[in-house]
């Protein structure tokens, strides 16, 4: 059988050229063994591994196996010892019939890497069959006038053995009239002829009975016998003669049954019964031949279907016998013409599935193709779909390997359905399709991928510990353990961030939990990295950034910085009675540790000794006079201010202000008692006279001292002349300024300076006495200079 290698634009086709039939892989020359037929099963034919130069252990490691055409297991390979064993008893006549020599072809297939070795096993014939005649008796009718030397053909004996074990000679029982001559046919077979030695006499002996013996050439020889019954007839002068001694015809193998093959014709010059001719197949071929002859017309017709692959030609001998017993013969040589009636056959030797996705040039399958037809009818094309990443490669005779053409990607396609098509070149073309499914196994070639490169989580402060604050998620395109993701917290880049005490992550699902209650005022935001690692080998990982923003809760009440409410000697604001409406009495300064609207403060005058005398601005905390002051107004006033934030619910604080109405600033005024009377005391003329006298007496001296104090205050803030008494001890921690720019963690100094020319004081927030470590921006001065009119502190 021939194959050719071809390729079309539509398909990647692979066809063996005739020369490829003789190409073998390196080191794979044919090894031939010979054993007699009927050898018992289990017989060790040879050590195949040794003959091929292979190590015994190599057979097992490379997956050695025997391949047989038709998948009939006749031989068995012991991969441990390398011995080739007979799997069953072999009968040459059953396996090969009359074909000589009888050779069985096997292939030794080695995987990883793929390699083929051709092995041939020849079965030699033994003399296990005796010759057999098709009939127990042959009848010959011979006229008594037949001349000595006349030859009479006899039917041959059948012997299924071949060569010297087939029929070699014929003998006849001793007699005085005949002997047997043995001749060779064109196909090497022997056939007998009966030769008349002495004329017959019907009156003396009308019938003879002889024994014909067929002997084969075996040792010892086997024989078979039949009886020849000869009937002596009256004179018959002429024997039938065929028009041709040899008829040559061609018969297509797909000819229908009973179709006419050829017509033979013989004539006899005698008249009457002696001139009547009857035709018959000769030499016992009636049983084995697929033909039948009409004894009257000589038409040879087909009685069984022909098969070129089984028997490509026939030699049929025809005998014509007249009524007197004389006969003639001719030979019909029939050549069976091959037609494309056999589709190609595909035998899968090995199939590897699944295959790893990262291994190009991987052998997926090894298979063989065959077509019993001849010529173009047996020439084949093998192909697969052209859109697949696979390639067909011819290897050994009639063998192909299916290999991966490039690296596969299981994530893109996890399996391939491949159709292997084998088409012959006959007319019409016949084809065979074989479908295989190749699964692609996963390799850990994809790292986990987070759904987002960064995550922003919002957590309201004062949360409960172990609260789930969010989750991260990563997917892996691989499968199995290669796709199982484990989450973890990566070491923080900020060495001062104690991440392990803040959050934790569930390694299985990526849920994030806050380990403790968060305080916005202490930590407003932080970020960290999370990792996702698969369980492949080697493991692959990726990371994502997580930002946690702490949302402020209204958990801090406003804190009044000025005036201080815990001082043993609270400040008193002096207001001249000549002050105009809108005169700035003082400014309440408060802060809120929260942020946003939780730190938006509003001010409200909650209580006053004399309602309507003072007013307060809601947004800046300024206390101003609401009207002109009169002599009837009490000198001492106590104001209660409410400071409230804008949180939900709102929080508040109160501050108490002491205001003293004076006519001038001629002398310092002692601090007022902590509690001012709720109602104004009655004016006393005596008090006014004393105050006026004291004021006039000390006006000049006081003015000079005030001027000097203002100058010194402006030059050096470290030693102000006028200063409110600030009790020792720090303020409450974690104070945030109104703008929410930072946290106040240390005590601050406050300073009230009074200028003589302007009549206005300056209220300043100074830098902390002890440097503190605050977040960026928190180290700035919390308060900017705020003007306070007529504010004066008494020591």
Swiss-Prot record:
It is found in: Cell membrane. Glycans are attached at residues 169, 417, 435, 566. One of its GO terms (molecular function) is calcium ion binding. GO terms for biological process: cell adhesion; homophilic cell adhesion via plasma membrane adhesion molecules; nervous system development. It is a single-pass type I membrane protein. It holds the Pfam family Cadherin. Keywords: Acetylation, Calcium, Cell adhesion, Cell membrane, Glycoprotein, Membrane, Repeat, Signal, Transmembrane, Transmembrane helix. Residues 1-30 form the signal peptide. InterPro entries: Cadherin-like_dom, Cadherin-like_sf, Cadherin_C, Cadherin_CS, Cadherin_N, Protocadherin/Cadherin-CA. The chain crosses the membrane at residues 690-710. Residues 31-689 are extracellular. It comes from Pan troglodytes (Chimpanzee). This is Protocadherin beta-5. Gene3D superfamilies: Cadherins (2.60.40.60). One of its GO terms (cellular component) is plasma membrane. Potential calcium-dependent cell-adhesion protein. May be involved in the establishment and maintenance of specific neuronal connections in the brain. Residues 35-133, 138-242, 247-346, 351-450, 455-560, 567-670 form the Cadherin domain. The modification N6-acetyllysine is found at residue 296. Residues 711-795 are cytoplasmic. The lineage of its organism: Eukaryota, Metazoa, Chordata, Craniata, Vertebrata.
